[in-house]
Amino acid sequence: EGCCSNPPCRHNHPEVC
């Protein structure tokens, strides 16, 4: 996922990773 490889997004949306 793009979000999971983007640290700020991953931090804000851990449930998708």
From Swiss-Prot:
<keyword id="KW-0800">Toxin</keyword>
<keyword id="KW-0008">Acetylcholine receptor inhibiting toxin</keyword>
<dbReference type="GO" id="GO:0099106">
    <property type="term" value="F:ion channel regulator activity"/>
</dbReference>
<dbReference type="InterPro" id="IPR009958">
    <property type="entry name" value="Conotoxin_a-typ"/>
</dbReference>
<keyword id="KW-0027">Amidation</keyword>
<keyword id="KW-0964">Secreted</keyword>
<dbReference type="GO" id="GO:0035792">
    <property type="term" value="C:host cell postsynaptic membrane"/>
</dbReference>
<protein>
    <recommendedName>
        <fullName>Alpha-conotoxin In1907</fullName>
    </recommendedName>
</protein>
<keyword id="KW-0379">Hydroxylation</keyword>
<keyword id="KW-0528">Neurotoxin</keyword>
<dbReference type="GO" id="GO:0005576">
    <property type="term" value="C:extracellular region"/>
</dbReference>
<dbReference type="InterPro" id="IPR018072">
    <property type="entry name" value="Conotoxin_a-typ_CS"/>
</dbReference>
<dbReference type="Pfam" id="PF07365">
    <property type="entry name" value="Toxin_8"/>
</dbReference>
<feature type="disulfide bond">
    <location>
        <begin position="4"/>
        <end position="17"/>
    </location>
</feature>
<keyword id="KW-0873">Pyrrolidone carboxylic acid</keyword>
<feature type="modified residue" description="Pyrrolidone carboxylic acid (Glu); partial; in In1874 and In1857">
    <location>
        <position position="1"/>
    </location>
</feature>
<feature type="modified residue" description="4-hydroxyproline; partial; in In1907, In1891 and In1874">
    <location>
        <position position="8"/>
    </location>
</feature>
<keyword id="KW-0629">Postsynaptic neurotoxin</keyword>
<feature type="modified residue" description="4-hydroxyproline; partial; in In1907">
    <location>
        <position position="14"/>
    </location>
</feature>
<feature type="modified residue" description="Cysteine amide">
    <location>
        <position position="17"/>
    </location>
</feature>
<dbReference type="GO" id="GO:0030550">
    <property type="term" value="F:acetylcholine receptor inhibitor activity"/>
</dbReference>
<dbReference type="GO" id="GO:0090729">
    <property type="term" value="F:toxin activity"/>
</dbReference>
<feature type="region of interest" description="Ser-Xaa-Pro motif, crucial for potent interaction with nAChR">
    <location>
        <begin position="5"/>
        <end position="7"/>
    </location>
</feature>
<feature type="disulfide bond">
    <location>
        <begin position="3"/>
        <end position="9"/>
    </location>
</feature>
<comment type="similarity">
    <text>Belongs to the conotoxin A superfamily.</text>
</comment>
<keyword id="KW-0872">Ion channel impairing toxin</keyword>
<comment type="function">
    <text>Alpha-conotoxins act on postsynaptic membranes, they bind to the nicotinic acetylcholine receptors (nAChR) and thus inhibit them.</text>
</comment>
<keyword id="KW-1015">Disulfide bond</keyword>
